[in-house]
Amino acid sequence: MSSKDSFTPDSVPVCVFGGGNGWGKRVAETMRTAGFDVRIVEKDASNADIRQAISASALLFVAIPDPAINSLLQDHGKAMHGRMLIDCATNKSGFSKRLQELASEGVSICSSHPMAVSSAALRGQNVLLMPIGSNAVAAENAAHRIYGLLGMRIARIDFTQHGEIMALVQMLPHLVQRTFIDALATGLAAQNQQIADLTTLASANYLLAELGLGRVAAQRGEISAGIIATGMASEFGRTLLAALRESLDTIQKTSDSRSELAALFDAATQRIDPEGSWRRDMADKSEAGLIRLGNLRSRSLAIEAPNRIGMLRDILTVLARHNIDMTALDSQLMTGADGSERVRFEIGISNSHLPQESICRELETIGVRLHGNDTRE
């Protein structure tokens, strides 16, 4: 049995700080389902309740708002000795020094950063693990178990690199997409167009970019504001902004020469991908994404079903009986209204007409619901 496997419900009582919502709630529910004894402590708990919870727990998972974490660590750090400590904060600058102090004192610490919102379908989503200090193994194993239960893809980085990496993978994309949205608003108003109109008019490149753009637009503005403000507070973040400005200036100055622009773009691409392997991989992935997107946008069925082995086979058997020609398939794990694990299938089809009522009746006999269909040409 590996050390990761030895992290078992009967050996590790867990305390989740901030377990009432967000990531704390998701982790608490997941660990309870796996059989762990989990207690929840909210950010407004009394010092006595916090001390009691720490004393009774072997693993402390911290999911309270970032600004409150440093106070928790300052006030109760000594009580955390002999325990495992994991945080899942996005911005660690306010308490990173205290985490490193506790690690040097022997607390087993693994900082983490899930790269998706807690309400998302998490299977295959990235989570960063950052063990701190020489005693981090136990906490890192615990983090592996927790995020493994959620089906997430684990990447390990150095804790001191976190801020710079977030500037690259969070600040820069949010910065570009928010300026893109602002420029689109100006252009759409000038042309008397609606944003939805562009989807039916646009090129393949726009449709792929629209996915990232739309995801950011669907989020509250404070999400981008927090990410960008945090990034800009660092010298590295400001360096990236300066590089972006310089690039735009150079493009504008060179825009009267296609050959110079092409050379500029090729040189930049060569800098990030000298051997071309990333570009080849992206060409394949983007083509596959466009094919699936095109199939699903043309004609599709949305089906919600219990998550069990053999369910997809049963659904496809029903569709085959009705001569439904499937062209694409995507799936997403979700939680049903009753708390059960369910899966949503988006199935691309070539049929222009469906015997919807009879299909619905047959699907209902196996516990499956047809959410709707789109049979646009």
Please describe what each predicted stretch is.
Residues 12-15, 127, 301:
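Conserved hydrophobic helix-helix packing surfaces used for dimerization/oligomerization
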Residues 124-125, 278-377:
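A conserved regulatory-domain signal marking ACT and ACT-like small-molecule sensing domains
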Residues 99-167:
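Rossmann-fold dinucleotide-binding core
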Residues 194-274:
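Interdomain hinge/lid region at the active-site interface
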